[in-house]
Amino acid sequence: MLHKIYTLNLNFEKNFKNYNFHNLYKELLNFCTVDLSAFYFDIRKDTLYCDPKVSEKRKSTLLLLNIILDSLLKWFAPILSFTTEEIYQLVSKSKKSIHLEKFTDFPKKFENINLYEKWSKLIQIRDACNLSIEEKRANKEIGSSLEASLEIELNKELYKIFKDVDFAELCIASSVKIKQGSEKEIKVLTQKATGKKCPIC
């Protein structure tokens, strides 16, 4: 996500200097709807609600959310001047205006092409899992994705990258089993998980 913010900020500065407001707005809208709403917020809400306050994962999530909020306020300030000012006055300890702030100059270490490419592939796997889950939902076999138990078959290339990734969290599923297959495409088998879903979840 930091890599995405880094590259988006570079594109924003370029589009802003060239008065290319259409592309500027389009990239910001895509970031908010696809990267944040449909992905990051979806997989991180349980961390915020359920993990202890001292959890390192929860702390890093909060830190990133603050970076995202600060970035979005500055990016949207030229477009949504009154809205961003109201939010800025609510969250900022400074008495200045958002329109007096400088755009953030993110450190080069935020750029990580290898990690970005890895996560692009992981999201590809997640999309295949979501498609399989939606088919079960359409057939009324499951309700929430948390009622799903997944078996994923990956080719050799994709199988290498799943280590250190909690696919149950990534796919918001009850459990996930992964095995290596010989086929090029991703295969996903979705079944109704055993046990009962938490009523709070």
Model-derived features: positions:
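Aromatic-lined ligand-binding clefts that engage carbohydrates, nucleic acids, or primary amines
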Residues: 25, 29
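A glycine-rich helix N-cap at a beta->alpha junction
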Residues: 164-178
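Short cysteine-rich clusters marking metal-coordination/redox-active sites
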Residues: 198-201
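Short, flexible, mixed-charge glycine/proline-rich loop motifs
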Residues: 187-195
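Short helix-adjacent coil turns
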Residues: 16-23
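Hydrophobic residues within the alpha-helices of tandem HEAT/HEAT-like
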Residues: 32-33
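Acidic, turn-prone loop/beta-hairpin segments
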Residues: 1-13, 41-132, 139-154, 177-188
